Protein backbone atom coordinates (compact mmCIF):
# COMPACT_ATOMS: atom_id res chain seq x y z
CA UNK A 1 0.00 0.00 0.00
CA UNK A 2 2.79 2.39 0.85
CA UNK A 3 4.31 2.07 -2.62
CA UNK A 4 0.90 2.67 -4.24
CA UNK A 5 0.40 5.82 -2.16
CA UNK A 6 3.87 7.06 -3.07
CA UNK A 7 2.93 6.62 -6.74
CA UNK A 8 -0.26 8.61 -6.19
CA UNK A 9 -2.63 5.71 -6.79
CA UNK A 10 -6.09 6.03 -5.26
CA UNK A 11 -6.89 2.34 -5.75
CA UNK A 12 -4.74 -0.77 -5.98
CA UNK A 13 -5.85 -3.64 -8.19
CA UNK A 14 -5.65 -6.93 -6.35
CA UNK A 15 -6.92 -10.49 -6.34
CA UNK A 16 -8.49 -11.83 -3.16
CA UNK A 17 -8.31 -15.56 -2.49
CA UNK A 18 -10.42 -17.38 0.06
CA UNK A 19 -7.98 -19.85 1.61
CA UNK A 20 -7.88 -21.95 4.74
CA UNK A 21 -6.00 -20.93 7.85
CA UNK A 22 -3.46 -23.70 7.19
CA UNK A 23 -2.83 -22.55 3.62
CA UNK A 24 -2.58 -18.96 4.81
CA UNK A 25 0.10 -19.97 7.31
CA UNK A 26 1.95 -21.97 4.64
CA UNK A 27 1.86 -18.98 2.25
CA UNK A 28 3.17 -16.65 4.97
CA UNK A 29 6.02 -19.03 5.75
CA UNK A 30 6.84 -19.46 2.05
CA UNK A 31 6.96 -15.67 1.60
CA UNK A 32 9.31 -15.36 4.58
CA UNK A 33 11.58 -18.07 3.20
CA UNK A 34 11.74 -16.33 -0.18
CA UNK A 35 12.86 -13.01 1.32
CA UNK A 36 16.30 -11.97 0.14
CA UNK A 37 17.61 -10.89 3.55
CA UNK A 38 17.13 -14.24 5.27
CA UNK A 39 20.39 -15.96 6.24
CA UNK A 40 20.94 -19.46 4.87
CA UNK A 41 20.62 -20.94 8.37
CA UNK A 42 17.35 -19.06 8.95
CA UNK A 43 16.11 -20.24 5.57
CA UNK A 44 17.02 -23.84 6.44
CA UNK A 45 15.22 -23.59 9.79
CA UNK A 46 12.13 -22.14 8.12
CA UNK A 47 12.11 -24.92 5.53
CA UNK A 48 12.43 -27.50 8.30
CA UNK A 49 9.51 -25.86 10.11
CA UNK A 50 7.44 -25.87 6.92
CA UNK A 51 8.11 -29.58 6.43
CA UNK A 52 7.64 -30.74 10.01
CA UNK A 53 4.77 -28.49 11.08
CA UNK A 54 2.69 -29.06 7.97
CA UNK A 55 3.62 -32.70 7.42
CA UNK A 56 5.22 -32.10 4.05
CA UNK A 57 7.95 -34.02 2.31
CA UNK A 58 10.94 -32.32 0.71
CA UNK A 59 9.36 -32.50 -2.74
CA UNK A 60 6.26 -30.63 -1.46
CA UNK A 61 8.40 -27.90 0.08
CA UNK A 62 10.47 -27.65 -3.09
CA UNK A 63 7.32 -27.22 -5.17
CA UNK A 64 5.90 -24.53 -2.86
CA UNK A 65 9.21 -22.65 -2.86
CA UNK A 66 9.99 -23.05 -6.54
CA UNK A 67 13.27 -24.81 -5.79
CA UNK A 68 14.73 -28.19 -6.69
CA UNK A 69 14.36 -30.99 -4.14
CA UNK A 70 18.17 -31.28 -4.01
CA UNK A 71 18.37 -27.60 -3.00
CA UNK A 72 15.94 -28.25 -0.15
CA UNK A 73 17.95 -31.31 0.95
CA UNK A 74 21.19 -29.28 0.93
CA UNK A 75 19.57 -26.49 2.97
CA UNK A 76 18.26 -28.97 5.55
CA UNK A 77 21.69 -30.59 5.89
CA UNK A 78 22.99 -27.26 7.20
CA UNK A 79 20.94 -27.82 10.35
CA UNK A 80 23.31 -30.68 11.29
CA UNK A 81 25.87 -28.06 12.30
CA UNK A 82 25.86 -27.18 15.98
CA UNK A 83 24.79 -23.74 17.21
CA UNK A 84 28.46 -22.98 17.98
CA UNK A 85 29.49 -23.86 14.42
CA UNK A 86 26.66 -21.82 12.95
CA UNK A 87 27.58 -18.84 15.11
CA UNK A 88 31.19 -18.94 13.90
CA UNK A 89 30.13 -19.28 10.27
CA UNK A 90 27.73 -16.34 10.48
CA UNK A 91 30.01 -14.28 12.73
CA UNK A 92 32.90 -14.51 10.29
CA UNK A 93 30.73 -14.00 7.19
CA UNK A 94 31.44 -17.41 5.73
CA UNK A 95 29.17 -18.68 2.98
CA UNK A 96 26.71 -21.52 2.66
CA UNK A 97 29.29 -23.37 0.57
CA UNK A 98 31.81 -23.08 3.42
CA UNK A 99 29.20 -24.61 5.72
CA UNK A 100 28.41 -27.43 3.31
CA UNK A 101 32.11 -28.26 2.96
CA UNK A 102 32.35 -28.69 6.73
CA UNK A 103 29.48 -31.18 6.69
CA UNK A 104 31.79 -33.72 5.05
CA UNK A 105 33.56 -34.05 8.40
CA UNK A 106 32.27 -36.61 10.86
CA UNK A 107 32.44 -34.87 14.21
CA UNK A 108 31.86 -31.47 15.71
CA UNK A 109 35.46 -31.44 16.98
CA UNK A 110 36.80 -31.98 13.47
CA UNK A 111 34.54 -29.28 12.05
CA UNK A 112 35.55 -26.76 14.73
CA UNK A 113 39.23 -27.57 14.15
CA UNK A 114 38.90 -26.98 10.39
CA UNK A 115 36.63 -23.97 10.91
CA UNK A 116 39.25 -22.30 13.10
CA UNK A 117 41.84 -22.79 10.34
CA UNK A 118 39.44 -21.40 7.73
CA UNK A 119 38.82 -18.32 9.86
CA UNK A 120 42.46 -17.81 10.86
CA UNK A 121 43.69 -18.12 7.27
CA UNK A 122 40.67 -16.40 5.70
CA UNK A 123 40.19 -19.27 3.28
CA UNK A 124 37.85 -18.95 0.33
CA UNK A 125 35.42 -21.76 -0.51
CA UNK A 126 37.76 -23.57 -2.89
CA UNK A 127 40.60 -23.61 -0.37
CA UNK A 128 38.21 -24.67 2.39
CA UNK A 129 36.98 -27.60 0.31
CA UNK A 130 40.60 -28.61 -0.40
CA UNK A 131 41.47 -28.38 3.31
CA UNK A 132 38.53 -30.63 4.17
CA UNK A 133 39.41 -33.15 1.45
CA UNK A 134 43.07 -33.20 2.54
CA UNK A 135 42.02 -33.73 6.16
CA UNK A 136 39.74 -36.63 5.18
CA UNK A 137 42.52 -38.14 3.04
CA UNK A 138 45.05 -37.92 5.88
CA UNK A 139 42.56 -39.46 8.28
CA UNK A 140 42.05 -42.44 5.94
CA UNK A 141 45.82 -42.95 5.65
CA UNK A 142 46.14 -43.02 9.46
CA UNK A 143 43.45 -45.68 9.77
Question: What do these predicted regions represent?
Answer:
Residues 1-40, 88:
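A short, basic-hydrophobic beta/loop patch
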Residues 35-38, 42-143:
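Amphipathic alpha-helical extensions and coiled-coil-like segments
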